A protein has these predicted regions:
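Non-catalytic nucleic-acid-binding interfaces of large nucleic-acid enzymes and RNP effectors
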Residues: 50
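Active-site-flanking segments in enzyme catalytic domains
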Residues: 45, 55-62, 66, 70-332
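Hydrophobic, membrane-inserting alpha-helical segments
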Residues: 1-39
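N-terminal low-complexity, Pro/Thr/Ser-rich intrinsically disordered segments
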Residues: 37-47
Length: 332
């Protein structure tokens, strides 16, 4: 029954005075041993020739996360075993375009799935944290979908059908603990600094390009093409750096609080990242996004989950229960 303050004091600050040093397993409610992920644990469409390198980069990153939640990692290891989209003859593909998501189409006459597309980042760059968080987020969505109530249909995902988790989203809650609010403020300030710095570089590059155009050293079509390219690259760099800022994953924690607020937190500017009230009008989406964010953070940023646990212990308990229930269903 170690309190969060004692946990932080002992295992973050390194002060163990007056504490009985328990094993990690005892502290983490006797969770299973952390076992490494392997490529054969994933669905075939994530390990084929086209996707093998990307999935291996994800596996290598996750296996290096020593403090990852063993139960959540165990659930990701069941992804291949629980796959029921292509296994049921439904077309399924993986791509790396913009707008990361699990997209699907269905037949309106009977609600049956027509096809599914998993859109995830192509892992690249010096810091993969933000991209790994996004990939784990989307792959948790995929597992949530695998465990839908009727495998033939598109709806009834496991999280939104889970009574305990769903109960948290029947009413909105806009409360944010002081330490988390301070974290969000610092994150917003850092993202503003990143944005200002990259936009300043963009203005300089644009000015140089404009001078070349007026000097007639490049054509208008070349100018337009180059301008669109540097503008796109600046936008991508802002997103890349902000998602990695302050250790990465803070955007996911913000989205959990946005879901709890029904989207009003993002609408009001209390969080920088979130889906907003138009999206979260669908109560089921609040549970789905929260589980996906929890899954990613439990692997990459378990310290942020401990902050969430301190503020919303019953929510984290419900999320842990969802993970356990999905593991049981998968035979784990």
């Amino acid at each position: 029954n170690m309190k969060y303050t004692d946990w932080k004091k002992a295992f973050v600050d390194g002060v163990k005075d007056g504490l009985t040093v328990a094993t990690v397993g005892a502290i983490m409610k006797a969770k299973r041993e952390l076992e490494p992920l392997k490529a054969e644990m994933f669905p075939e469409y994530l390990t084929d020739k086209k996707e093998r390198k990307n999935t291996q980069a994800l596996i290598d990153y996750v296996n290096a996360c020593e403090n990852a939640d063993p139960d959540v990692v165990a659930l990701y290891s069941k992804m291949g075993a629980m796959e029921n989209i292509r296994a049921n003859g439904i077309p399924m593909k993986v791509s790396h375009g913009k707008g990361y998501a699990v997209n699907y189409r269905y037949y309106t006459r009977n609600d049956q799935l027509a096809d599914v597309e998993l859109i995830i980042p192509k892992l690249a760059g010096d810091d993969l944290t933000g991209q790994v968080v996004t990939t784990l987020h989307e792959e948790m969505h995929l597992m949530d979908m695998f465990n839908r109530s009727d495998p033939a249909k598109y709806s009834g995902w496991f999280s939104s059908s889970h009574a305990k988790l769903s109960s948290f989203f029947q009413k909105t809650n806009t409360d944010i603990a002081d330490d988390i609010d301070s974290l969000f403020e610092a994150f917003d300030k850092e993202c503003k600094r990143i944005t200002a710095e990259i936009n300043a570089e963009l203005r300089t590059a644009t000015s140089t390009l404009t001078d070349q155009y007026y000097a007639r050293t490049i054509s208008y079509s070349d100018y337009k093409k180059a301008f669109n390219k540097i503008k796109r690259e600046a936008s991508e760099q802002i997103d890349y750096q902000c998602r990695n800022a302050m250790g990465g994953g803070i955007s996911s924690l913000e989205d959990i609080y946005d879901a709890l607020s029904g989207g009003s937190a993002r609408d009001a500017g209390l969080v920088r990242y979130g889906h907003g009230s138009k999206y979260y009008r669908d109560i089921g989406k609040r549970a789905e996004e929260t589980l996906a964010n929890y899954g990613a953070l439990s692997v990459v940023r378990p310290d942020l989950i401990e902050m969430l646990r301190k503020d919303k212990p019953e929510l984290v308990e419900a999320l842990e229960e969802v993970i356990q229930d999905m593991l049981k269903k998968a035979g784990g």
